[in-house]
Structures are given as structure tokens and as C-alpha cells.
């Protein structure tokens, strides 16, 4: 579903496109964190929280851009391939499509939940088709906080996808997430370092399984 105009600016979509073509890593202290399976992950310290913002660049082979974007937007299918999803659904709030997402955390930590806006645009950049998906946390009275679950108030993600010229997808992803609570920042950063590449690998695997089903 398309969100109402105004959830994200035109400029934000084109910024994600631009990063896919030319990574914007200069002028800030972005550090190369890890390179694995054709994926490079950079991080930048957010001094206010002690947490890191992440930028991911790479290629997912044998997974077409359109299919990858469709799978990312398919909340029902994500419940099948993402083992950390406790609850995930879309709801109309004030004329906009809002996503509610509860994530399983290991005991004894409380689960986290998110309420966020998400929008997809398929753009034409000099004849190249680029799928861009933007997401950011929001608050809606209709989706209030739940007892025993910690609401994530700071969440932002950008995803830009185009063909790698073969059967795969060239991908750029930006990610920032502050899970709140009493989890030490070093543990959050350790989890993100592993979780970000694993998420992309899981999504690539979901592409393969989806193709087998159809």
C-alpha cells in the first residue's frame, strides 16, 4: 500500500537512490565494520545515544530487485521467514498506512515493538529502475504502548535496490534503531553488527524460497 503523500519527501527518496550509485561516506567518521559475502557494512557513532547508524552496500545474487522489494513489503510472508517476528500487521491511521511490529527478544529481556510509517517508490534514474523503501518510527494513539513490551521510539531505515546487471540485486541500506530499556550500548552494537548482515542473508533466502513456492 502507498502511504499518503507527505510521509516522506521526494528528496529523501532521491537521496537513497544517490547512495546506491555513490556511497556518501566522506565528511563524517564512517568506519568500515565488516565485509562478508559481498556485503560491506559501515557505521557512524551517534554521540547522543552511544549507538551506531549503519550503511550497508553490496549485491544479493540470484534475487531480482522487484522480488526483493516485494518481499520486503510483504508483512504476511515476513512472518514465515523472520524468526524474530512476534506480531506484524498494517493498519490505517489518520489516512496513512502504519505498520505495527513486535520483535522477540531473548529472555530475560522484554520484547520490543515498533509503530512506523513505510513507503515504497519505484523510480526511474536515467533509464535504470530503482526501488526505494523508506521507514521511520511514529506515534499513533490507536496503537498505544503495551504492558511488558518496550516501545522503540527511534527507528529509521532506507532501502534502495536495482539490478546488478545479472540475475541479482545491488543494494543500499541505512539503518538506525534505539531499542531503549536497560540494555548496555555495547550489547546493542554487537547485536546490530551481526543482525544487519544476517537480515540481508535471511531476505535473500526468503527470495529463493518464494521462487520455489510460485
From Swiss-Prot:
One of its GO terms (cellular component) is cytosol. It is found in: Cytoplasm. PROSITE patterns: START. Signal peptide: none annotated. A 1,2-diacyl-sn-glycero-3-phosphocholine binds at residues 72, 78, 157. Keywords: Acetylation, Cytoplasm, Lipid transport, Lipid-binding, Phosphoprotein, Transport. Changing residue 63 to A: Reduces activity by 20%. Highest expression in liver, placenta, testis, kidney and heart. Low levels in brain and lung. No expression detected in thymus. It comes from the Eukaryota. One of its GO terms (biological process) is phospholipid transport. The modification N-acetylmethionine is found at residue 1. Residues 1-212 form the START domain. CDD domains: START_STARD2-like. This is Phosphatidylcholine transfer protein. Catalyzes the transfer of phosphatidylcholine between membranes. Binds a single lipid molecule. The modification Phosphoserine is found at residue 139. Interacts with ACOT13/THEM2. SUPFAM superfamilies: Bet v1-like. The gene is PCTP. The keyword Transport applies. InterPro entries: STARD2_START (IPR041950), START-like_dom_sf (IPR023393), START_lipid-bd_dom (IPR002913), START_lipid_transfer (IPR051213). GO terms for molecular function: phosphatidylcholine binding; phosphatidylcholine transporter activity. It comes from Homo sapiens (Human).
Amino acid at each position: 500500500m502507498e502511504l499518503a503523500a507527505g510521509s516522506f519527501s521526494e528528496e529523501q527518496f532521491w537521496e537513497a537512490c544517490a547512495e546506491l550509485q555513490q556511497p556518501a561516506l566522506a565528511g563524517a567518521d564512517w568506519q568500515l565494520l565488516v565485509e562478508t559475502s559481498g556485503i560491506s557494512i559501515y557505521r557512524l557513532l551517534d554521540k547522543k545515544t552511544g549507538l551506531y547508524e549503519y550503511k550497508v552496500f553490496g549485491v544479493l545474487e540470484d534475487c531480482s530487485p522487484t522480488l526483493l522489494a516485494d518481499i520486503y513489503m510483504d508483512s504476511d510472508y515476513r512472518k514465515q521467514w523472520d524468526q524474530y517476528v512476534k506480531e506484524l500487521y498494517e493498519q490505517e491511521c489518520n489516512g496513512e498506512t502504519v505498520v505495527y511490529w513486535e520483535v522477540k527478544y531473548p529472555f530475560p529481556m522484554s520484547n520490543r515493538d515498533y509503530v512506523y510509517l513505510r513507503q515504497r517508490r519505484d523510480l526511474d534514474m536515467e533509464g535504470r529502475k530503482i526501488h526505494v523503501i523508506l521507514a521511520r518510527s511514529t506515534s499513533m494513539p490507536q496503537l498505544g504502548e503495551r504492558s511488558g513490551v518496550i516501545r522503540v521510539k527511534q527507528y529509521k531505515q532506507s532501502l534502495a535496490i536495482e539490478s546488478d546487471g545479472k540475475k541479482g540485486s545491488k543494494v543500499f541500506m541505512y539503518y538506525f534503531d534505539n531499542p531503549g530499556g536497560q540494555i548496555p550500548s555495547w550489547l546493542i552494537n554487537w547485536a546490530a553488527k551481526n543482525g544487519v548482515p544476517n537480515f540481508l542473508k535471511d531476505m535473500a533466502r526468503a527470495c529463493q524460497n518464494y521462487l520455489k513456492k510460485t
